């Protein structure tokens, strides 16, 4: 029996990436964006285009449009949704995750879900730079998926 394993590498040679980032909660999203750009720079990505949208809810439509353009090997969606006193948090978090997943499935281009849903700003700060930077981690996933797709 032959078993073949395929895996994407963490290299940016020849890759073009798009980042869609929400401006809402920019104290946190700016840190996620910095982490992602740092990752792409360290791994030699040739081109990164950043698209800023008002909030996380607006991410999926832009991610889908960018994926359809054929210009990018992967799209990275970055945002922060902080729980408040209303159901708005649940609605936004659920719809954004569905929309980002659909954008990738419909277009066949990896669209990485980098929207963090947190209980409060402190949790957000812990994920966007104080303890670690999830933006860097999500960018690593984008690299891996873009390279894996090239093998298929």
From Swiss-Prot:
- List the source organism: Thermococcus onnurineus (strain NA1)
Q: What is the designated name of this protein?
A: 6,7-dimethyl-8-ribityllumazine synthase
What are the GO BP annotations of this UniProt entry? riboflavin biosynthetic process
Which keywords does the record carry? Answer: Riboflavin biosynthesis, Transferase
Known catalysed reaction(s)?
(2S)-2-hydroxy-3-oxobutyl phosphate + 5-amino-6-(D-ribitylamino)uracil = 6,7-dimethyl-8-(1-D-ribityl)lumazine + phosphate + 2 H2O + H(+)
GN (gene name): ribH
Give the matching PANTHER family: 6,7-DIMETHYL-8-RIBITYLLUMAZINE SYNTHASE, 6,7-DIMETHYL-8-RIBITYLLUMAZINE SYNTHASE DMRL SYNTHASE LUMAZINE SYNTHASE
Describe which pathway this protein belongs to, using the record's wording.
Cofactor biosynthesis; riboflavin biosynthesis; riboflavin from 2-hydroxy-3-oxobutyl phosphate and 5-amino-6-(D-ribitylamino)uracil: step 1/2
What does this protein's UniProt record list under function?
A: Catalyzes the formation of 6,7-dimethyl-8-ribityllumazine by condensation of 5-amino-6-(D-ribitylamino)uracil with 3,4-dihydroxy-2-butanone 4-phosphate. This is the penultimate step in the biosynthesis of riboflavin.
UniProt entry tagged with the keyword Transferase: yes
Cite the InterPro entries for this sequence.
Answer: LS, LS/RS, LS/RS_sf
* Positions that bind (2S)-2-hydroxy-3-oxobutyl phosphate: 85-86, 127
Q: What is its EC number?
A: 2.5.1.78
Top-rank taxon, per record: Archaea
Write out the GO cellular component annotations: riboflavin synthase complex
């Amino acid at each position: 029996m032959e078993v073949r394993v395929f895996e994407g590498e963490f290299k940016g040679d020849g890759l073009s990436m798009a980042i869609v980032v929400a401006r809402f909660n920019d104290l946190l999203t700016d840190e996620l964006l910095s982490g992602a750009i740092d990752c792409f720079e360290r791994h030699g990505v040739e081109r990164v285009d950043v698209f800023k949208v008002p909030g996380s809810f607006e991410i999926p439509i832009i991610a889908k449009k960018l994926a359809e353009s054929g210009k990018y090997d992967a799209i990275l969606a970055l945002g922060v949704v902080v729980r408040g006193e209303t159901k708005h948090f649940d609605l936004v978090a659920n719809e954004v995750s569905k929309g980002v997943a659909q954008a990738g499935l419909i277009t066949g281009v990896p669209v990485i879900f980098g929207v963090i849903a947190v209980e409060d700003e402190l949790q957000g700060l812990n994920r966007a730079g104080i303890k670690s930077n999830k933006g860097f981690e999500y960018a690593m996933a984008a690299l891996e998926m873009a390279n894996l797709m090239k093998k298929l």
